């Protein structure tokens, strides 16, 4: 992962994260981890599963509303918010040494293979 001292112009906080034309899932995982790091965002650093539980539910409901409305632009945004919540909760457990995003993906794939 390449990092830069310049943050994106519109950032409310200065991130040491490279601004790019487009990002992928690995960037998303790295960014969430960075935000929780000592050099990241003070708010993100202190969050727990319990403190952001409501956010997870709210983002899920907002994704459902976008699906119900057939609004693909809003749906893409809200699915990103749900994914951010998954990554955030996973990063808390990665820090604790319990599991990481690859473990979550492994368990999900195994479940799908078993069910199908």
Q: How would you label these PLM feature ranges?
A:
Residues 1-79, 84-115:
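Flexible "arm" and connector segments at domain edges
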């Amino acid at each position: 992962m390449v990092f830069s001292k310049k943050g994106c112009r519109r950032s409310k906080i200065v991130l040491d994260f490279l601004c790019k034309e487009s990002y992928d899932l690995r960037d998303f995982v790295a960014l969430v981890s960075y935000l929780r790091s000592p050099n990241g965002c003070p708010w993100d650093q202190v969050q727990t599963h319990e403190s952001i539980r409501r956010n997870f539910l709210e983002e899920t409901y907002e994704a459902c509303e976008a699906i119900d409305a057939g609004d693909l632009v809003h749906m893409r945004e809200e699915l990103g918010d749900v994914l951010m919540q998954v990554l955030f909760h996973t990063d808390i457990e990665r820090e604790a040494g319990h599991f990481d995003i690859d473990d979550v993906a492994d368990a999900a794939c195994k479940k799908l293979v078993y069910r199908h």
